[in-house]
């Protein structure tokens, strides 16, 4: 994923749409992310499966883990987050620069949200339609949900101990000092 952010920068992209390869994100729904970015410019727009009239339903253990993760992430980021594992994003160029320098490898969505907020970037969520998974398997399965949750919570806790990296901060990048 980080290589994609770096390539987008090298190509001069002002924005990048990121979506998971499991078929859950209908590409046509990207219009909603773009409309949100035009209406209220921000650094990241996340397509959330938990919007008004959502028909998304995961198994009970997944729903419980994601609700707990969303609550914890919302608290540490001081921003309401409903879908901490969504891989459907519209990323602005300044945030691309940050992610080209720093991007988490283990639990990228939740850790990236914590990272971008720590570095001073802003984000919004927009409800989008999600389809059932078309390919692959979720990394969050019923038996492994507790293990997944424990690892993500630990990663987020450790992330809170890190200081802001000036090279990847919103203030530094938006003043035109970043590569």
Where are these regions (language model features)?
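Acceptor/aglycone-binding surface of glycosyltransferases and processive sugar-polymer synthases
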Residues: 1-11, 15-17, 27-106, 133-152
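Hydrophobic helical membrane-anchoring modules
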Residues: 6, 76-79, 101-179
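A ubiquitous, low-specificity "background" feature that marks scattered single residues
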Residues: 16, 26-28, 89, 115-117, ...
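The conserved acidic donor/metal-binding loop of glycosyltransferases
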Residues: 20-24
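Hydrophobic alpha-helix-in-membranes signature
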Residues: 25-26, 126
């Amino acid at each position: 994923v980080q290589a994609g952010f770096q390539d987008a920068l090298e190509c001069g992209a002002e924005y990048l749409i990121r979506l998971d390869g499991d078929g859950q994100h209908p590409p046509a729904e990207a219009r909603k992310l773009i409309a949100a970015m035009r209406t209220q410019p921000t650094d990241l727009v996340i397509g959330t499966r938990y919007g008004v009239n959502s028909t998304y339903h995961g198994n009970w253990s997944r729903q419980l883990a994601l609700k707990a993760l969303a609550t914890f992430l919302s608290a540490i980021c001081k921003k309401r987050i409903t879908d901490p594992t969504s891989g459907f994003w519209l990323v602005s160029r300044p945030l691309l620069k940050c992610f080209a320098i720093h991007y988490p490898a283990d639990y990228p969505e939740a850790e990236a949200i914590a990272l971008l907020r720590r570095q001073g970037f802003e984000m919004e969520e927009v409800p989008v339609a999600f389809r059932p998974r078309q390919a692959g398997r979720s990394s969050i399965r019923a038996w492994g949900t507790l293990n997944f949750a424990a690892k993500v919570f630990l990663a987020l806790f450790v992330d809170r101990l890190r200081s802001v990296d000036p090279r990847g901060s919103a203030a530094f990048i938006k003043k035109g000092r970043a590569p």
